[in-house]
Structure formats: C-alpha cells, structure tokens
Amino acid sequence: MVGFKNRYMLMEVFLDPDKDLLGEGTPIILTQFNLSKAIKDSILVNFGECGLGSSLGSFQVKYVNPITKLCIVRSSREEHRQVWLAITLVKSIGNCPVILNLLDISGCIRACRDTALKCDKEKFEQCSKSLSEEEIRQMNTSLEKIKLLEN
C-alpha cells in the first residue's frame, strides 16, 4: 500500500496593524480558522472552484502560534505549488493586511516541526523580556503543542 504524499509548509505571518482596512486599531488574532479561510479564499479567487476542490483533499493548517506568528500548512504533493502560490497571494486575514513568508517546505511533519520549534524558540528568546505572564504561559503552551505534532 502506498502512503499519501504530503508537503508541509512552514510560514511566518507579518501582520500590519497600522494599515487596518476598516480603520480600527485592533489587529486580528491569528487562528487556524482565520488562516485557513484566507488561504482557501485565495485559492478560490486565483484558481476557481476546480482548483479549490483539488486542493482541499489534504489541505489543513496544522499549527499556528499567535505570538510568534509561525504556522504549518499541509497540502498534497501534487497541489502544493498551487497552495504555495495562493499563500503568496494572500493580502489580508480578516480586515488586517498581512504578508506571508514561506520559511521551509518539507515532505514530513517531523522535519517541519523541528524547524518550527527552532524558529519559535529563537523568536521567543528575542521577545521574552517584553511579554506579559499570560503571553509567556501561552507561548509555553504553544511550544508543548508543537512538540506533540505528528499527524
């Protein structure tokens, strides 16, 4: 039996709270749902319903860290370039303008997880002095969650 081939994309999300489209001062909170919806909308706009249907087979946002803004997206090996292009063309999540930067593409979740863990730890060390107790607790929870990431 042949296993299903996936690609895992590690991305960094840059939020721009100063240029909020509605003029409100609060930036959006990054969640798996928000990111997934933005990418699916981009696939629909750029590739149509057929492109969206072919991409949804294994598309999933596996991990999102709302503090460091790192996320892991899974897609099928056949459609990963289409998903990658759609990710590049995402301009906003909700009403907040964003830029998505691809950091790594991997064929297995373990390699992507290790890279994400390394990036998360580096970013956490850089900004740990300016974080509140709640944010530090949330960051530690996110680090534990990524260590358990397998499927």
Swiss-Prot record:
Its gene name is EMB1687
Q: Which domain of life is it from?
A: Eukaryota
Q: Name one Pfam family in it.
A: RNase_P_Rpp14
Q: Which UniProt keywords apply?
A: Nucleus, tRNA processing
The text of the family note is:
Belongs to the eukaryotic/archaeal RNase P protein component 2 family.
What PANTHER family does the annotation carry?
Answer: RIBONUCLEASE P PROTEIN SUBUNIT P14 (PTHR15441), RIBONUCLEASE P_MRP PROTEIN SUBUNIT POP5 (PTHR15441:SF2)
Q: Where in the cell is it found?
A: Nucleus, Nucleolus
Subunit structure, briefly?
Answer: Component of nuclear RNase P and RNase MRP ribonucleoproteins. Interacts with GAF1/RPP30.
**Lineage, broadest ranks:** Eukaryota, Viridiplantae, Streptophyta, Embryophyta, Tracheophyta
Membrane as UniProt keyword: no
Supply the name of the protein: Probable ribonuclease P/MRP protein subunit POP5
Q: What happens when the gene is disrupted?
A: Defective embryo arrested at the globular stage.
Q: Is Phosphoprotein one of the keywords? A: no
Describe the task this protein carries out: Essential protein required during embryogenesis. Component of ribonuclease P, a protein complex that generates mature tRNA molecules by cleaving their 5'-ends. Also a component of RNase MRP.
Write out the transmembrane intervals. Answer: none
Q: Note the InterPro entries from the entry.
A: Pop5/Rpp14/Rnp2-like, RNase_P/MRP_POP5, Rnp2-like_sf
Q: Name one GO cellular component term.
A: nucleolus
A GO BP term here is:
tRNA 5'-leader removal
The species this protein was found in = Arabidopsis thaliana (Mouse-ear cress)
GO terms assigned for molecular function: ribonuclease P activity; ribonuclease P RNA binding
